[in-house]
Structures are given as structure tokens and as C-alpha cells.
Amino acid sequence: MNSQTLSRNLKAKTLSENHNIRLHRAISWIKCAEKNEGNLDVQFIALWISFNACYAVEINGLTSKSERLKFKTFIDKLIIHDSENRFYNLLWQKFSGPVKMLVENQYVYAPFWEYTRGEINEWENSFRKSCESAHRFLSKEKVGDLLEIVLDRLYTLRNQLMHGGATFNSKVNRSQVKDGYNIMKLLVPIIIDIMMQYDTEDWGNINYPIIVV
């Protein structure tokens, strides 16, 4: 499902201003990814911004959740509305390819970098258990738990790119950027489509509403 189809579907819906702005922003970044064909760094970043536009909610001081917990809660809500099992089908079809490659890539496993920086003493045992858990969650159709692992890896990759931890178009991290892009380009349109269908769900307020002056 491309940005053109999503935009057409959005125009056909009557949504609240808050929800319409959220989805319009998310679709615009999918369009950006499509326009930058062949530029994996920019495409992945654009798709992450699109994803971020979907799950970003209003932050309320000290009661705000961490970003990781916030998008886990968001994904759990999406899965409830995924009556066609699109998330599971995506993970099942892609597990032998980009999903498995990403999950088993130590360079997008946050504790590996914490160990490298001397912040923790060990990372290999937890990494092995995480990989084993991913296989188990797939076999038991625990979609939310598997997505949490995948998104955790993607979040680490996002941090590397957004915080200057990687060289643009570098050969060093091509495999994880390519796998991340191949997952996000399929995952994000599903998220937007579900949010569009279940527009009466409370998806929260957007962080930066349009201010009329």
C-alpha cells in the first residue's frame, strides 16, 4: 500500500481534525521515502518519522511514559484491531529474510553498545535469549512480543542514524539499514490503514497541533 492509496483513502474518510492531521503527516513521510528510492538512510529515517507521527501522543510532565513503553502500548492497541492478522502474516512471511537478519544482528542490539561503552559487563547471553525468544514468539503467534523485539532493534538503528552514530551511505551498516527499511516499508502502511479504519479509537492527542494565528 503506497502513499497515493493511503492519501486517497484518507480523503474519503471523515475524521476528527486531530486524527486527520496525524495520519496526513504520517502519509507525507511515506511519500518522502518513496521519492528517495535507492537512498536507504533517508528512506529508513522518513519511515521512522512516519511511524513516530502515528504513535506520538501528548506528553504530560512527569507522568509521561518512556518512548519504548509508549510504542509498545501503541502496538498492543493496534494488534487488538488487526482482525486480518496482517502483522503476523508480515512477520511470518519476512522472518526468514529481513526480520530474522535484523533480530540476529548484534549491531542493532542496544546492550551490545552498552557493553562496548563499558556500561555493562556482558551482552551475549541476553542477546542469545532475545533471538531464541523471537523464534518462540513467532511459533506461538505472540505477535506483540515479537514486534516488541523487532521494534527494539529498529529503535537502536534509528538512534544510530538520528544521533550521528553512522556515516551517510556507509558500507559498514548497509545490511541493518536495508533490513530495517524493508520491514518499515511494509509495517508502517499497515499501521496507518488500521488507524484509519478504527478512527473512533483513542489514539491520543498529537504533540504539535496546528496553531492558527
Where are these regions (language model features)?
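Short amphipathic alpha-helical segments and their helix-coil junctions
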Residues: N20-G38, A134
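Short, hydrophobic/amphipathic alpha-helical patches that form generic packing surfaces
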Residues: S28-C32, I45-A56, R153
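Short, surface-exposed loop/turn segments at secondary-structure junctions
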Residues: E37, L62-K65, F168-R174
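Helix-loop junctions and short alpha-helical segments
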Residues: M1-N20, L47-F137
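Helix-start/N-cap signature of alpha-helical segments
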Residues: N39-Q43
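Polyanionic, low-complexity intrinsically disordered segments
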Residues: S3-N9, K13, E17, Y115-V213
